[in-house]
Amino acid sequence: MEELTPRRIVEELDKYIVGQKNAKKAVAIALRNRYRRKKLPEDFKDEVMPKNILMIGPTGVGKTEIARRLARLVKAPFVKVEATKFTEVGYVGRDVEGMVRDLVETSIRMVKQEKMAMVEDRAQKMAEEKIIELLAPYPVQQTAARNPLELLFGAARQAEQTDKNQEQRIKRIDFEREMLREKLARGELENEYLEIEVEDSKPPMLEIFTASGGMEEMGVNLQDMLGGLFPKKKHKRRVTVREARKILTQQEAQKLIDMDEVTAAAIKRAEEDGIIFLDEIDKIAGREGYGPDVSRGGVQRDILPIVEGSTVMTKYGPVKTDHILFIAAGAFHISKPSDLIPELQGRFPIRVELESLTCEDFQQILTEPRNALIKQYTELLATEGVKVKFTENSLVEIAKIAYTVNEQTENIGARRLHTILEKLLEDISFEAPELTGKEIVIDREIVLEKLGELAKNKDLSRYIL
């Protein structure tokens, strides 16, 4: 984290998101402040609260992507929730505490994967030993005596003979296992089939009442509650050695990690580094106390204690929300940030306005980011042996059309490019298997031929683009 200076964070975000310098700067500072807080003395650390961010801007300009890439950059637990999914207590809908529970689940998954990666080599060796056991099992010890008379006559001689046979068999199997071990190391058995026992991954679920009175599926499973009284259900599967190695490595890795340690580390990570992205905050900005939107103000009041810092009960234990970073976002076309209740406004001190995308922005989005759309489409078609090239003037035209359609109809930001490229490459994608080995050049004329009329006709572009 030390090398992630605000400037470096912005540079990393620039690899995936075009423009929006102010928003990138705000999140970079918020992230760096977390690192600074961790270096403070213990007695002062708890006094420093994160400065939550409110992003204001139309859809498709990069609000969610900025938050998501930021979380990936620092390996922080991240959840995106829509504020419209929540309702105040007493109405049908999700309880606002659900977002904290989701964050803890994400954190548990992250820490568990990290711990499993640390023991992967050991787990793989154990899995390979299991595969060898399944391919060359030791014989089952059989009782020498078959009827009561044998217990009196000749039982000792027979037992001696049986033991010798057993020893020879075991030696033969040991030799066979060594051969299998060598073949397994050389990858010669990858496509051989064998039968393995697989544990059921889905435990029985219970719905329980939460502290706020709502019904929330917390994933409490009977096994945790009854302390392993019931053994885990298993079923047999016939798989290749390659698949068996993956399944058994996973099972062995889970046995090697300490889940109590995972839970403690995950809760700490969620509390200290967690990021909750509250989308569509503008949709609950009204303060009406009647009609279909009666619970809007109630949702804001319910969100308030979580944002300002409270303790939420989860199935893994209590989680403090004091130092979780909240990033709220909304288009605010109809409502204004000032329509939020004053207490909630005060909890989002950093306001960032994201600009609508220009024609130049669209051009950059097509080619510059690491996951640029043009790269995505050309790589997809390359898997069929079709080489697609876009000329510079074709990219300019695509950007112009995207900008024009956004201006004439609803502004959906960069998502408009997906619609336009799908329409443009529709025939090529359909015929790709028959075009193997060919090179297709897409220039301005082809773009205008496919999309020109649609873009000019307002009614058509409203439905098709």
Curated annotation (Swiss-Prot):
It comes from the Bacteria. The keyword Nucleotide-binding applies. GO terms for cellular component: HslUV protease complex. It is found in: Cytoplasm. GO terms for molecular function: ATP binding; ATP hydrolysis activity; peptidase activity; proteasome-activating activity. Its main location: cytoplasm. One of its GO terms (biological process) is protein unfolding. Gene3D superfamilies: 1.10.8.60, P-loop containing nucleotide triphosphate hydrolases (3.40.50.300). Keywords: ATP-binding, Chaperone, Cytoplasm, Nucleotide-binding. ATP binds at residues 18, 60-65, 279, 343, 415. InterPro entries: AAA+_ATPase, ATP-dep_Clp_protease_ClpX, ATPase_AAA_core, Clp_ATPase_C, HslU, P-loop_NTPase. ATPase subunit of a proteasome-like degradation complex; this subunit has chaperone activity. The binding of ATP and its subsequent hydrolysis by HslU are essential for unfolding of protein substrates subsequently hydrolyzed by HslV. HslU recognizes the N-terminal part of its protein substrates and unfolds these before they are guided to HslV for hydrolysis. Belongs to the ClpX chaperone family. HslU subfamily. A double ring-shaped homohexamer of HslV is capped on each side by a ring-shaped HslU homohexamer. The assembly of the HslU/HslV complex is dependent on binding of ATP. This is ATP-dependent protease ATPase subunit HslU. It comes from Pelotomaculum thermopropionicum (strain DSM 13744 / JCM 10971 / SI). The lineage of its organism: Bacteria, Bacillati, Bacillota, Clostridia, Eubacteriales.
